[in-house]
Regions:
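Flexible mid-to-C-terminal extensions adjoining Fe-S/redox cofactors in radical SAM and related proteins
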Residues: 179, 184-278
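Short hydrophobic segments within beta-strands
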Residues: 8, 72-74, 225
Length: 278
């Protein structure tokens, strides 16, 4: 009751006999990563030969069983040109696909994987494709208002609001029972369900209590930034990339926020111009 359960899985080990069970438990969502519609690119990223065909087949079986599925397509240098095809595939199946074009550092604070992160120039090309093909992203982004408009009415309330849902409305549980705040934050263990109840962890973990104290006021620079609404601020991104410093503001995140704002304005002007010419 009052609990939504989602599963994050590559689905390569999904068995046919498990599908009725997944349907019976009434999952909120199964999310899986599909990095490209090119099998070679997908398998190169996963380092598992044949994983593309297995994941794709599993997605289609789940869709056929009317189990909610969402495709995640994190972008990096190896698959930066393939999101549009993944999105079209998802649209064909009538399911949602989303991308993350800012690669996150590893949960163990190792940043060596960021060599594969998209440059600002590559991110711009990807964002232009997203504005063109991803209707949901387009609708959400084009309806954003400058944050100043919202803040001037009740800035005090805004500053007291949490940065995200971490510690408030979501957590993750691994197969070994470890509980952590959100996907990508595996090293920040809150407790273990084999040693204590989830209720006890959620209500009494000192780490959860600490996360709940973090609000928009903890980031004064962000609170006054004109690109605030176009920024995907994320505690775990900062934590992983900045040697465990939740309050760090890596420059790349800020650059992408301003890029997103600029492209949104350009695209909006393009739409308005087309409407006037019609």
């Amino acid at each position: 009751k009052d609990l939504k359960i989602s599963i994050l899985s590559n689905l390569i080990s999904l068995k046919d006999e498990q599908i009725p069970v997944l349907k019976e438990v009434n999952l909120s969502l199964i999310q899986t990563s599909l990095y490209s519609m090119n099998p070679e690119i997908h398998d190169k990223i996963t380092t598992v030969k044949g994983s593309f065909e297995k994941t794709k087949a599993a997605i289609e079986k789940l869709v056929a069983a009317d189990i909610p599925v969402q495709i995640s397509c994190p972008l990096m240098k190896a698959n930066k040109d393939g999101y549009a095809d993944v999105l079209k595939y998802a649209q064909k199946l009538k399911i949602k696909a989303q991308t993350d074009y800012i690669m996150m550092a590893q949960a163990n604070l190792d940043t060596s994987n960021l060599a594969n992160r998209l440059s600002l120039e590559e991110t711009e090309k990807v964002l232009r494709d997203i504005f063109e093909y991803d209707l949901e992203y387009q609708a959400i982004t084009l309806n954003l208002k400058p944050k100043d408009e919202e803040r001037k009415f009740d800035k005090e309330r805004f500053l007291k609001e949490p940065v995200c849902g971490v510690g408030y409305d979501n957590c993750c549980i691994t197969a070994n029972g470890d509980v952590y705040p959100c996907a990508g934050w595996q090293e920040y263990v809150l407790g273990n369900v084999y040693k204590q109840s989830l209720k006890e962890i959620w209500e009494n973990s000192e780490r959860v209590k600490y996360l709940r104290k973090i609000t928009n006021a903890s980031f004064p620079k962000c609170a006054d930034c004109e690109a605030f609404n176009y920024c995907n601020r994320c505690l775990v991104r900062s934590f992983n990339e900045s040697n465990g410093n939740i309050f760090a503001l890596p420059k790349h995140f800020c650059d992408v926020a301003f890029l997103n704002m600029r492209l949104a304005k350009e695209y909006e002007e393009k739409i308005m111009k087309t409407m006037y010419q019609s």
